[in-house]
Amino acid sequence: MRALMKGALACLLAACGEGDAEVSCGPASGRVAEVLDGDTVVLESGERVRYLLADAPERTGAGGDCFGPEAHAFNRGLVEGRRVTLTYGEACEDRFGRLLAYVSVEEREVNTLLVERGHACVLHVPPAGRSRRAEFQALEAQARLARRGVWGACAPVPCQR
């Protein structure tokens, strides 16, 4: 009876997770076909993916934003043509229909790298990213204090307008 109960508990934990249920919104991985800007990519499968909690300066438009080309180049150097892993948060898509995900390449999470190196600011649009918001805000505060990226190059900082 005890073995049966342990087995049932193991199955329940496997099925339900241990309180850290991940949302499955799209593919778990894919190859990046195109880097649109500092915080958005297109996979070979056609899905557009917006990085959760990272808001990079725009590189297009009326002259683009300060540090937009640098953020785009940094992102391209990390992910273009490479296989990435996608982890989803509390929401699957933004209002433009893009998948919202934490994107990793070779065990490095691109979202956190962008914020900690000053290539992006934190953007929290509830509920997406709620569980990791404080972590990203701490990374942004460190980048701001060290005047990395946008924090040293731009006045005003594009994502602070």
Where does each model-flagged region fall?
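Small beta-barrel nucleic-acid-binding modules, primarily SNase/OB-fold domains
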Residues: 2, 6, 12-161
